[in-house]
Amino acid sequence: MDRLPRSALASNIEVTAATVQRGDVIQLGGRAYRVQDLFQLPQGAKQLLFESGELLTIHTRTRLAAVRMMRRR
């Protein structure tokens, strides 16, 4: 993962298909994956494309631990 900008704050959150955003860093199997892009699928599911090139499809009820960078004002 890249160094974090000094003007950003990291916030631990739980994400779902409805709340996941580009740039979120999701913890899977003890590894961190940054969301590069996401695609809406039928019935509220989403497919996440990570910077590593890997894909993950999440259902509407899937809940994942993540870190979201918040910019300071």
Task: Identify the function of each model-found stretch.
Residues D2-A10, L55-R73:
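Intrinsically disordered, low-complexity, charged/polar segments
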